C-alpha cells in the first residue's frame, strides 16, 4: 500500500518506497500534512510503523516475503514497480523495454542519473551483477528467475542498456521484474561472504529513497532520507522512517492509539480492529485485496502423504465459524489457491466445507493411519493463526486425533519450510501478491520445481499439475493460460494439497494525521 511522498514537475508520483504495511503493499509519502505526534518525532519528520514479524536479513536477494518488502521498497530500486489498485506495472529504473519476436530477448533502457547511496551511478553493469548475484545465491526471489534466466544471458550492452535473454518464453516475464532489486557491486567488493552476503545481511547497498541507519534482527530498522534520489524530493518530505517489531498484538494496538507509532499491520483480530475504528485519532482503511490464508500440510510426510487424510482434515475445519463468527464476515471464503477475484480461479470451484461425517468417511478410506499427534504451527504475533489452529485442533479432536499447537515466529517457520525434513506438519500463513499473476499462487505453491522455497512447503508433487503449470508459464494467450490454471486448480483442490480459507480485504490502521494513503495489493 502506498502514500504519496513527493511530486515532480507538477504531477504527483506514487512512491512505493516508504512504508510497507500489513504485508499487502507499501507506503510512500508525498505532500503529507504533518501534525506532530510522538510517532512523527518532534518536528513531524519521522514515520514509525509497527509490525509483528522480525527482519531475518537486510540482503534483498536473500529474502522474499511480506515483511522484507518493507526494506526492499524503501532501501532499493527496481526496473519496474506496481502501483495502485488494481495494480499496474510502471517503469522505475528502466524507462522502456523492447522484446524480440520470439519473446526470448528483453532489452531495457535505464534512466540516466540514478545514484546509489554512495554516489555511484546506477548502470547496466549493476543490473547485470544484481541478476547474477541473485541467481548464484539461490535465495529470496531467485526461484522466480532460475527456471528461465541463464546468468550468461544477462548482458550490459551499453552504460544504460541491459539485455536479458531467457531460455523459454515466460508469460509473466515483465510482471516478475518488480521483486528484482538492484544492488551496488562496488560497495560489495571485498565484503565478507559470497557476493558480500554476510556484510549485506546487516547493511545497505541500494539506491532507494532511504538509506539504512540502524538494524536489529529482533527489533527492526531505521533509515534516513536519501536526498539525491532520482525522483526529486519536493514539498515536506519524511526525513526518517522506522520499522519496529512489536510481537504482541495488544502492544501494537496500544502503541498506535497512544501515538507511539503512526501505523501498524493489518493482521489484527476483529475486536482490535473494531476498537481502532472507534478511536477518533485512528483511521482504518479497507480495500479489496488478493491475499489468501492457507493452512499448509506436508504432503510427503505420513500421515499427510495419504490424500484421504488430507481430505479428512480439510472437512474437519469449521470455515463458517472462523469466517463469520471469529472474523465477523470481514473476509470472503476462498476455495482454492488462487484468489477468487483474479483470473485463473475457477468460478464454479466448490472446495471443502465443514462436514465431520465426510471427514470420518475419508479417514476410513485412508491406507495410512494417524498413529501420532499432529503438530500445527501458528505464527507469533498473528492472532488469527492462533484462532485457526484452535479450530483445527477442535475439529480433529472430534475424530479422535490429537493436535499439538506450537507457536513460532515467521522467520523460524519460513526457514524450516524450505527443507523437506524440517518443514512443519502443518503451519498457517497468508500468500500475498508479489506479482499479479496466478503463477504467484498456484505456480509457486504447487509446482514441484519450486520445492525448497517456503511458498512450496506443502511438498506437493503431481506430474499432471506440473505439466499444466509449465505450459501456463510458457504461452502468451491469457485465455489459454486461464484454462490451464483453472484445470490445475481443480486437481490441486481435489488432492487437498492444503486448506484454503479466505481471500481478504486490506484493513490498514493509521493515525488520523496520516494523509494520502494509496493502496496497492502487491507485496
Range-by-range predicted roles:
Residues 1-17:
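N-terminal secretory signal peptides
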Residues 25-29, 34, 216, 220, ...:
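Detector for C-terminal structural segments
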Residues 83-88, 178-236, 240, 248, ...:
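Gly/Pro-rich hinge or "lid" segments in bacterial periplasmic/extracellular proteins
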Residues 109, 143-189, 214:
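Surface-exposed binding/hinge segments that line
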Residues 123-132, 159-165, 208-209, 237-240, ...:
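Alpha-helical secondary-structure segments
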Residues 198, 228-274, 402:
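Ligand-site clamp/hinge motif
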Amino acid at each position: 500500500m502506498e502514500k504519496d511522498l513527493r511530486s515532480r514537475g507538477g504531477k504527483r508520483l506514487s512512491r512505493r518506497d516508504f512504508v510497507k504495511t500489513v504485508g499487502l503493499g507499501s507506503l510512500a509519502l508525498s505532500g503529507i500534512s504533518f501534525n506532530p505526534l510522538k510517532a512523527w518525532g518532534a518536528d513531524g519528520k519521522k514515520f514509525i510503523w509497527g509490525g509483528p514479524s522480525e527482519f531475518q536479513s537486510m540482503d534483498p536477494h536473500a529474502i522474499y516475503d511480506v515483511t522484507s518488502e518493507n526494506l526492499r521498497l524503501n532501501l532499493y530500486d527496481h526496473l519496474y514497480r506496481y502501483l495502485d489498485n488494481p495494480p499496474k506495472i510502471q517503469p522505475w529504473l528502466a524507462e522502456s523495454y523492447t522484446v524480440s519476436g520470439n519473446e526470448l530477448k528483453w532489452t531495457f533502457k535505464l534512466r540516466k542519473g540514478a545514484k546509489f547511496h554512495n554516489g555511484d551511478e546506477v548502470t547496466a553493469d549493476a543490473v547485470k551483477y544484481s541478476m547474477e548475484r541473485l541467481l548464484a545465491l539461490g535465495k529470496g526471489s531467485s526461484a522466480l528467475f532460475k527456471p528461465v534466466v541463464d546468468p550468461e544471458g544477462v548482458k550490459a550492452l551499453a552504460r544504460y542498456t541491459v539485455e536479458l535473454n531467457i531460455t523459454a518464453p515466460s508469460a509473466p516475464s515483465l510482471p516478475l521484474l518488480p521483486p528484482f532489486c538492484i544492488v551496488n557491486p562496488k560497495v560489495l567488493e571485498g565484503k565478507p561472504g559470497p557476493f558480500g552476503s554476510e556484510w549485506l545481511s546487516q547493511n545497505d547497498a541500494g539506491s532507494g529513497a532511504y538509506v539504512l541507519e540502524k538494524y536489529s534482527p529482533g527489533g527492526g530498522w531505521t533509515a534516513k532520507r536519501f536526498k539525491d534520489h532520482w525522483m526529486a524530493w519536493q514539498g515536506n518530505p519524511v526525513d526518517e522512517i522506522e520499522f519496529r517489531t512489536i510481537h504482541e498484538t495488544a502492544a501494537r494496538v496500544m502503541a498506535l492509539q497512544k501515538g507511539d507509532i503512526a501505523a501498524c499491520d493489518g493482521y489484527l483480530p476483529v475486536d482490535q480492529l473494531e476498537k481502532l475504528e472507534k478511536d477518533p485519532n485512528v483511521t482504518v482503511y479497507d480495500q479489496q485485496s488478493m491475499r489468501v490464508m492457507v493452512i499448509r500440510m506436508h504432503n510427503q510426510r505420513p500421515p499427510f502423504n495419504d490424500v484421504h487424510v488430507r481430505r479428512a482434515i480439510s472437512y474437519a475445519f469449521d470455515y463458517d465459524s472462523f469466517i463469520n463468527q471469529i472474523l465477523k464476515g470481514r473476509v470472503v471464503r476462498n476455495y482454492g489457491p488462487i484468489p477468487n477475484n483474479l483470473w485463473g480461479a475457477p468460478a464454479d470451484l466448490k472446495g471443502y466445507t465443514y462436514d465431520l461425517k465426510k471427514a470420518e468417511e475419508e479417514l476410513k478410506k485412508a491406507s495410512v493411519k494417524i498413529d501420532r499427534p499432529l503438530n500445527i504451527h501458528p505464527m507469533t504475533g498473528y492472532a488469527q493463526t492462533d484462532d485457526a489452529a484452535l479450530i483445527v485442533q477442535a475439529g480433529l479432536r472430534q475424530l479422535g486425533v490429537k493436535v499439538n499447537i506450537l507457536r513460532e515466529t515467521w522467520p523460524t517457520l519460513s526457514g524450516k519450510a524450505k527443507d523437506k525434513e524440517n518443514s512443519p506438519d502443518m503451519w498457517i500463513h497468508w500468500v500475498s501478491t508479489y506479482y499479479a499473476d496466478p503463477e504467484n499462487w498456484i505456480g509457486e505453491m504447487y509446482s514441484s520445481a519450486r520445492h525448497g522455497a517456503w511458498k512450496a512447503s506443502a511438498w506437493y508433487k503431481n506430474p499432471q499439475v506440473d505439466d499444466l503449470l509449465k505450459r501456463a508459464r510458457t504461452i502468451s494467450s491469457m485465455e489459454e493460460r486461464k484454462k490451464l490454471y483453472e484445470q490445475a486448480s481443480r486437481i490441486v483442490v481435489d488432492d487437498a494439497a492444503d486448506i484454503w480459507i479466505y481471500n481478504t480485504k486490506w484493513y490498514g490502521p493509521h493515525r488520523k494525521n496520516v494523509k494520502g494513503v494509496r493502496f496497492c495489493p502487491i507485496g
